[in-house]
Amino acid sequence: MNNIDRDLTIEKYREGYQKYGYSPKSLGWDKGRQKIRFEILLSFFECAGKSILDIGCGFGDINQTLSQKTSNAYSYFGIDLVDELINEGRSRYQSDHIRFITADFLEYSFTEKFDIIVASGIFNHKFISEDNDKFVEKVLKKAFSLCTEGVAFDFLSDKVDYCHSHTYHNSPERILGLAYKLSRNICLRNDYMPFEFSIFIGKDDHFNPADAIFNVYKKRISKLS
């Protein structure tokens, strides 16, 4: 993200936090649906015992869902541009398996990989000078290079009845096309909210030509039987 849009983004969320404090409203969510988004993002992967990177983590509230799903058997690393949000997250989620850092995801040099990488809401703000489509592509590529199992991101859909001047709505078809450049193991969900969707990109897209079924899918099914 360039300096202009980075500064504007920081200012936007800093002002929201000063106005609303610890509240989804500070992050632009105001309809009580944040928990649904978190549950959807974590639905594609088995999270127990896994390392999770949360891009644009805000307060890190996805930890509530992770804790419930895994009985606290996970490690978490949240990264966000805004100091105030990170500090709030640190004060609320104090555990040895939870870390936070204030940094730009695209600029930060990671020294580790993560099993699962998630992001909620980071593509929804319309930039002033940065190209939103290129930003999405850069984040997808870097995240996929850093994960070992897969990524899960959500978006505002362009299949809407209206849109605000400050929001950016992505085409599900375009995002699906970007995903297929990275893997064949893809899932797109638009079955939980009419104007939002999530993309899941699995790292392992290997399969046996004899049955043409993804190996990871067979492992998942075998655990259920």
PLM segments and residue spans:
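N-terminal, positively charged/glycine-rich alpha-helical extensions of SAM-dependent methyltransferases
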Residues: 1-22
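Conserved alpha-helix/loop element of class I SAM-dependent methyltransferases that forms part
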Residues: 32-48
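Class I SAM-dependent methyltransferase SAM/SAH-binding core
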Residues: 53, 61-99
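Conserved glycine-rich SAM-binding loop
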Residues: 58
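Short conserved loop adjoining the S-adenosyl-L-methionine
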Residues: 107-112
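A short, conserved alpha-helix within the catalytic core of class I
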Residues: 127-140
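Conserved beta-strand signature within the Rossmann-like core of class I S-adenosyl-L-methionine
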Residues: 147-156
